[in-house]
Amino acid sequence: MNLPRVLLFAATAMCMQVCAAQVPGTPGPTLPVPEQSNLPVNLPLNPSLPTIFIVGDSTARNKADLGWGDHFAHYFDTTRVNIANRAIAGRSSRSYINEGSWDKTLAQVKPGDYVLIQMGHNDGGTPVSDAFRGRGSGKGIGDETAEIPVAVPFTIGPLAGKTVETLHTYGWYLRKYIADTRAKGAAPILLTVTVRDIWTFGPDGKLHIERDMGFRDYEYEVGAAEHVPVIDMASVAADKFEYLGPETTRLLFPIDHTHTSAVGAEMNAASVVTALRNANSPLAQYLAPPKPPAYESAPALQAKPNIRAEPLSGAGPDKM
């Protein structure tokens, strides 16, 4: 069964009790704010360096430091590569294109760059809405379409001035990102969607965290068809959260079951880095020398000494 969710103030009180129980004598939760590398959207990019662009939703960029994309740059040698987080909260693979955000990002992409594409959390929404611009994409990866009304007119982007939109499938939108990126001489890379703090009992009688919210197979099918790497950060993150357990993991999701704290965002960024290494991605050549991750100093996590940002030698959770 799913673990119950509570109001934020109640969750905060519970977290204080959990931390105090795990670390006797510690006055409440002391999860530290990790090293920040928030990069303004309008930060000039060094034209002589390749750039790693991040295209996604609030799980990659949310407020000041709650998205993993804002904890990504310090893992890299930024004298050799630019990191550009272009994720926008609330977007889906469809709405990021429709509102013109993809065109703005694409205008900055040059030959030799990389584009990390991570969409899905908002693609399951309602395709048509009378109150706002729809976000949901069609199910599947095919070329089937549907003509739907544009409830709230666009003033910019590909739907500017139009009253009817052609709705495509999730896979179609991914293929558009891929084709557009390649047309600029850059390399597209798909990322599996971040995991949510939703737990259910498995056949082994133990609680397991949700690893797929319905888009994983689509990503892999598109990746295989288009010969694009799929970086499985979701499995790396899920392994870490299951190692921590439901109670400690809940400390990292104080808002809801989708959005993390700054510490959780740091862990997700570390999971992306680990997944890139595991896949022998060309992005690994730009990584800075490994250092202990900021979240390791959190008392609630010190009871789990093998929770690491980077895969280490040996067996066990260090491989996460």
Would you name each region that the model predicts?
Residues 21-33, 42-44, 48-54, 65, ...:
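Low-complexity, Gly/Pro
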Residues 101-262, 266, 271-288:
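Alpha-helical cap/lid subdomain in secreted, periplasmic
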Residues 23-35, 48, 246-320:
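Conserved catalytic region of serine esterases and O-acyltransferases that act on ester linkages
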Residues 23-89, 103-115, 131-141:
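Serine-esterase "nucleophile elbow" of acetyl-processing enzymes
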Residues 92-101:
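Structural motif
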Residues 1-5:
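Positively charged n-region of N-terminal signal peptides that target proteins for export
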Residues 6-17:
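Bacterial N-terminal signal peptides
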Residues 88-93, 198:
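Acidic helix-start/capping segments at beta-turn-to-alpha-helix junctions
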